[in-house]
Amino acid sequence: MSLSKASSSEINLGEKLRQLAKRAQHLTEATLTHEFIQSLREFVLQATGYNPLSQLEERVLNGRSDARLGGLIYEIKTPKHPLDEAVTQCRSYLDGYRRQGIIARGVAYNGLELALISETGAEIWRGKAEDGASLLEAWLLLLASKVVDPQHLVLLLGFPSTLACNFIADLLHAFRKHEKLGFVEEAFKVWQAVYGTAANLTEEAVNALKQRAERFSPPIDVRNRNEALQFVFVLEVYLSVLLRLFVARLAVQQRLVEQSTLRDLLHPFGSRPTERLRQLATVIPLLSSVFEDDPFLWLCDVADADPTFADKFDSHLDDLACILDELDLVGVSYDFLRRFYQHFFDPPIRRALGEFYTDESIVNEVLEAAGFDGTIDGVLADITCGSGTFLVVVIRKLIEKERQRARPMPDATLLCSITGKVIGIDLHPFAIAMARVNYLLALGELLSHKTLQAIGRLHIPVYWADSLARLVVPKQRQLASLTEVVKIPALGEFTLPHHEEVDWEKLFSALKEALPQRGVADPKKVEEQLKKRLDEDIVSRFEVTLNRLAEQWAERHNRNRDSRWLPLIRNMLAVERLRGLCSLVVGNPPWVRIHNIEPSLRNRVYNDYAFCRTAGWQRGAELAGITTGFARQVDYAVAFIERGLELLKDGGILALVVTSKIQQALYASALREHFVTRCQILRLVDFSLYEQPLFFEATNYPLVFAVRKEKPDAKKKTTVTLVNRIGRHWTYKLPQNELPLLADDPQSPWLMAPTEAIAAFRKMQEGNPLLGDIEALRPRRGVLTDANRLFIVRRVEP
């Protein structure tokens, strides 16, 4: 949407159409379409101050419509065609839009006559075009600015939009000018520390970002990988601001605030939009958990320090609010936001930001493997939730199942049940921002004003936290002063009273209150104020720990590092409390080779997770003539498998989609041994021969598995499905102790074959040595390097 203002000269649409009718006989259809649509856009611009974007020749189920302005579809013919032709075609397009979930009205026009068609296809009015101008004007004012589909929203708020490009450019300039400002610098460091776990800034992605930046006006400089990283950061800042405003718009529509528009919500007397953006948790208390602090709100700190950027950001937020006020978020599904994100960026840029939307077909495959039927007794968690696809599908199934009951529970009870059972966790703050909005959209019909008022504050249990991080209890002599150590990427290490001894929520609230709003913090005064707000018993037992905590946060405050990171610490506790509690853990953990993740995170994974620490099939490495060091190049997903098992209660089920390489790779030896000897393997679906679209425009070769946390029962069999190269499924059952290649070695790769084939293979093994045991015949792996772009050739032809 172009935000250029209308001229002062009044536009008479009726007269415009009258003049156009005089020339219509001599115009081509393309010229007539252009002049007609331009006249309508000029009228809307004059009446509202905003110029609606037209979408020409938009593809629908029944062909291509000539044009669309918001919620109005146009079919335009020249005068030599009867109007009925345009009416018939327009009705066909409306039917196509309806089947896509888009409700619109139609306008049929042939240069002389006009017909207005309702959402159901009924003809509301027909006559001379100029005579229908008044009714057409009313429809234009009502529908021309409406946002009706994701592609339309991309045009308004994505790269085609001047508004988006200007906002993103100003964010980047503000960041580069103020990157040493306390919170700004730390926000980028925290984001950078977790960025590599969700995305990979390849050379292809850097080049795509450079090309995109060059198309800005004026062009933005992205000259190297570091500047490309900054560009990705501000893109996520822009999108996170949009997500906050989406939720605020939903709150307006559901009457959770007194204001009737988002623009009014951001413009109360005596306040500025940038300031209100930071206050949304307070302004909309019923949805406060959605507005948790994250690394993306640094633009508010820049606005406090720089009036020029404050004015620019206020203007951009105001323009965004005007557009979002035309969006019906009550009727919007999770799929709307997914498609908006997918169409916002080119594939290389989307991969640079991170692929967060798992394809729903594979999600359903995982849930089916777990036996999830829309009911759950206990907690269901996705510890790598990304944008929340698993959570959304689970919520949808829970609601559908409940609605089918003879006596379904009241909405308020169902809402509390879902938010108490369905939990998401992710390390990437942008993914979490998307997941919270998607969680809200999935609850959809349950979010009525009446229901929300009945439950009070709605808690969305989607946590920004490192699900692999464990709370560390140091060895101490005095049990009474038991403490825990929390490590946060890029922030450091914090020692806290044990969460079973002290309520962390109260501790963090007291700490925030003890710190001054402005100016320099005196550690002694902070310590004194903190102790005043806590019980005497706690102060006496944890005096040394509290003194150190007060000193740490006072020092952070004096370096402009404030207490906004406390949620990260609190969320770690939320994850830790899931240990041994979950009935079902599902998800799609990141597939990243361990050497590609941030070094400190890599070291922690090796130190903390046995599946990684003891990785490397020793016998296999010997047979292949390679070192176990190479065999220990684990996939990051292996650590999440181990963590998922920790969070399960006895009898709980872990169901994930992971790389199919864990069936054979040397690095997955400890994992395979644990599954075969200590779990009941329920289901294996092997796509290693058949590419599967895990993400939009991205294919992989995954394995879907489901295991129960219980001692294996030899009487039970594992259901295995192999998918061949043309997508055909072959399902069979076998005892899980028949999976290992070597019957006496549960660490060995799995034989993904039916029992008859395995029996034949075992017969071949009897009394016969392995080639790897015969030195002269041992297969060799060859030279292994990390120089994947270099090739050794014998001769290059001239």
Predicted regions located by residue number:
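Short, basic/polar, glycine-containing "phosphate-handling" surface segments that engage DNA
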Residues: 2-26, 58-59, 63, 77-87, ...
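Signature of N6-adenine DNA methyltransferases within the class I
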Residues: 59-62, 113-158, 361-362, 392, ...
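Metal-dependent nuclease catalytic cores in nucleic-acid-processing enzymes
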Residues: 37-42, 89-106, 438-445, 637-647
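Acidic-basic catalytic patches of nuclease active cores, encompassing PD-(D/E)XK
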Residues: 9-54
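Conserved acidic residues
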Residues: 71, 104, 378, 583, ...
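Class I S-adenosyl-L-methionine-dependent methyltransferase module
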Residues: 377-381, 392-572, 598-599, 604, ...
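Class I S-adenosyl-L-methionine
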Residues: 41-46, 50, 176-178, 184-217, ...
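Active-site beta-strand-loop-beta-strand hairpin of nuclease catalytic cores
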Residues: 65-74
